[in-house]
Amino acid sequence: MKIRNACAVLIEVLLFILEGVTGARKISTFSGPGSWPCNPKCDGRTYNPSEECCVHDTILPFKRINLCGPSCTYRPCFELCCPESYSPKKKFIVKLKVHGERSHCSSSPISRNCKSNKIFHGEDIEDNQLSLRKKSGDQP
């Protein structure tokens, strides 16, 4: 029994050395823009899923910030901007997108209510060069 185990170990070591010398095993790397194993596409264009997303046939960076109503922001790669009411005073809710599923306002979990929480991510707004309106009482 010990001889069989020793032979198996010896064979494995020899195969390992042989692979290193001859380069028999090729390891593929995914460093180029068109070399992703599944080549995710958005409207026919390939994109990098570790840095970008596809929303309505448009490639967006993960840092992208959009307005949800007049006073709230959301990240379209990770969240949905959903109308809560269609009255003249429209109310909006930000909902989370569920990874791996097609997200809809009717079935996604609520992240926050835009009317009660005015959340602005300063660094994200600066990255996207969004401008904020000054309060009406502020002087220039």
UniProtKB/Swiss-Prot annotation:
Q: Which residues form the signal peptide?
A: 1-24
Q: Name one Pfam family in it.
A: IGFL
The UniProt record lists the keyword Secreted: yes
What the entry lists under InterPro entries is as follows: IGFL
UniProt keywords (A-Z) are: Disulfide bond, Secreted, Signal
Keyword Iron-sulfur found: no
Q: Name one GO cellular component term.
A: extracellular space
Q: What induces it?
A: Up-regulated by Imiquimod. Up-regulated in skin upon tissue inflammation and injury.
Spell out the subcellular localization from the entry: Secreted
**Tissue expression summary:** Highly expressed in skin. Also detected in colon, thymus, mammary gland, lymph node and lung.
Instruction: Describe, as the record does, how this protein assembles with itself and its partners.
Output: Homodimer; disulfide-linked.
Cite the PANTHER family for this sequence: INSULIN GROWTH FACTOR-LIKE FAMILY MEMBER 3, INSULIN GROWTH FACTOR-LIKE FAMILY MEMBER 3-RELATED
Q: What does this protein do?
A: Probable ligand of the IGFLR1 cell membrane receptor.
Sequence similarity:
Belongs to the IGFL family.
> What is the protein's name according to its record?
Insulin growth factor-like family member
Species assigned in the record: Mus musculus (Mouse)
